[in-house]
């Protein structure tokens, strides 16, 4: 971006610039996000005395920046809003997301069946609320047919609870 003036580095950025390079060389397969996490932990573990030279350097850079760009004002770029999708497409996407969320996992969560997927997913996206699944206690080694039957009973129980809640509102 031409004409863009970067902000001066803060103390952490001054310190992490060299540390990031070292960490990346020592761990070539480490992802940048992991390196950032490690740097954050390391920075927090430093004492004030260990951090002081980096704060001083950051202050020096800030002063130089102010002299070089006297009219500089930090103006973060705002994200451009993406236009809303059509209702039908929102339902399809929400339904697919919900279906993926509701697949069996190691915690054995209850599953909403059939047409309730699309309705629940659409309601979730419409109300901007998350759908919370309740864990189900099923003993290890439980036969698959009984697991499914147990799930259906849990689903019926969940529906009854929801109907009772709607009656009170």
UniProtKB/Swiss-Prot annotation:
Gene3D superfamilies xref list: High mobility group box domain (1.10.30.10)
Chain spans, region Sufficient for interaction with EP300: 52-84
UniProt-listed InterPro entries: HMG_box_dom, HMG_box_dom_sf, SRY-related_HMG-box_TF-like
DNA-binding region: 5-73
Description of how the protein assembles with itself and partners: Interacts with CALM, EP300, HDAC3, KPNB1, ZNF208 isoform KRAB-O, SLC9A3R2 and WT1. The interaction with EP300 modulates its DNA-binding activity. The interaction with KPNB1 is sensitive to dissociation by Ran in the GTP-bound form. Interacts with PARP1; leading to impair its DNA-binding activity.
Functional description taken from the UniProt entry: Transcriptional regulator that controls a genetic switch in male development. It is necessary and sufficient for initiating male sex determination by directing the development of supporting cell precursors (pre-Sertoli cells) as Sertoli rather than granulosa cells. Involved in different aspects of gene regulation including promoter activation or repression. Binds to the DNA consensus sequence 5'-[AT]AACAA[AT]-3'. SRY HMG box recognizes DNA by partial intercalation in the minor groove and promotes DNA bending. Also involved in pre-mRNA splicing.
Keywords: Acetylation, Activator, Calmodulin-binding, Cytoplasm, Differentiation, DNA-binding, Nucleus, Repressor, Sexual differentiation, Transcription, Transcription regulation
Region annotation Disordered: where it falls in the sequence: 144-169
Biased composition annotated in UniProt, kind: Low complexity: 145-169
Domain of life: Eukaryota
Name used for this protein in its record: Sex-determining region Y protein
Region (Required for nuclear localization): 6-22, 75-81
Positions of disulphide bridges: none
Pfam families: HMG_box
Chief location of this protein within or outside the cell: nucleus
Residues where N6-acetyllysine is found: 81
Region of interest called Necessary for interaction with SLC9A3R2 and nuclear accumulation of SLC9A3R2, as start-end residue ranges on this chain: 94-138
Species this protein is from: Rattus norvegicus (Rat)
Cellular component terms (Gene Ontology): cytoplasm; nuclear speck; nucleus; transcription regulator complex
GO molecular function, one term: DNA-binding transcription factor activity, RNA polymerase II-specific
Tissue: Expressed in the substantia nigra (at protein level).
């Amino acid at each position: 971006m031409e004409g863009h003036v970067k902000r001066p580095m803060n103390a952490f950025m001054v310190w992490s610039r060299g540390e990031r390079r070292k960490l990346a060389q020592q761990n070539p397969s480490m992802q940048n996000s992991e390196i950032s996490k490690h740097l954050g932990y390391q920075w927090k573990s430093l004492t004030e005395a260990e951090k002081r030279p980096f704060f001083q350097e950051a202050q020096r850079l800030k002063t130089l920046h102010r002299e070089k760009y006297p009219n500089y004002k930090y103006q973060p770029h705002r994200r451009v809003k993406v236009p809303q999708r059509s209702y039908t497409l929102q339902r399809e996407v929400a339904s697919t997301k919900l279906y993926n969320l509701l697949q069996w996992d190691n915690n054995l969560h209850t599953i909403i069946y059939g047409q309730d997927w699309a309705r629940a997913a659409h309601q979730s996206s419409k109300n901007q609320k998350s759908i919370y699944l309740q864990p189900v206690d099923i003993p290890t080694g439980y036969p698959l047919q009984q697991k499914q039957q147990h799930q259906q009973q849990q689903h019926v129980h969940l529906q009854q609870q929801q109907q009772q809640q709607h009656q009170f509102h």
